[in-house]
Amino acid sequence: MGSLRVPTQKSKLRDMSAGEVIKAYKRWAPVYDATFGRIVKAGVKQATARANGFSGRLLEAGVGTGLALPHYGPQLSVTGIDLSSDMLRLAQLRTHKAGAKNIEALVEMDACNMSFADASFDIAVAMFVLTVVPEPQKAMAELARVTKPGGTVLVVNHFSVGGGVRGAIEKGLAKHATKLGWRPEFPLDTVLACEKLRLVSLKTIRPMDFFTMLEFRRIA
């Protein structure tokens, strides 16, 4: 299967530091599930369903409060990382309450600079995180690095449309990116530049069509 052709939109990303992200999610952590849980529910459901078609070691980068953790099948050994210790504490509580036996580790770590060895995982998943990390293209390169050749990288994310009412709203919100803790303006081409990843599937997440799921294959 050849690489998919997708329309690209060029724009400059708003800078966000690791410190700003940590500060923002310290505020969001106590209310994240209540405010964003329903919004991301469909994306979590579809991404974990796809991930459950695989087996082996799985990395979830930007695991957050662990919304996805109870949904991974027992054939997957899951490691989750997040930059926010406040979010990770909630993920640990969720794992304990769910009695999830296949969670190998939950670690405070920067997705842009992971300490894992090359080719450590069979599949890597990044949901709702690439608009958050300080250097999204570096995060994509790291996801490729830690995934085995022939392995899979799944991305679920919001991508800006650049026009219309939604585009105007995204542009208006963009100046508040630091307080929000994510970039409302985030073009699709940002995640397509990694030479080690080949896009094999692109799917809009219904019902709201606000998120998109991308499946990449790790090139040997």
Region spans (language model):
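N-terminal, positively charged/glycine-rich alpha-helical extensions of SAM-dependent methyltransferases
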Residues: 1-28
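C-terminal alpha-helical "lid/dimerization" subdomain adjacent to the S-adenosyl-L-methionine
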Residues: 12-15, 19, 36-38, 154-213
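Class I SAM-dependent methyltransferase Rossmann-like catalytic core
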Residues: 26-37
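Conserved alpha-helix/loop element of class I SAM-dependent methyltransferases that forms part
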Residues: 38-56
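Class I SAM-dependent methyltransferase SAM/SAH-binding core
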Residues: 57-113
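A short acidic, Gly/Pro-enriched loop at the edge of an enzyme's catalytic core
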Residues: 112-123
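A short SAM/SAH-binding and catalytic strip from SAM-dependent methyltransferases
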Residues: 123-135
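A short glycine-rich, Lys/Arg-flanked "PGG" loop and its adjoining helix->strand segment in the class I
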Residues: 137-149
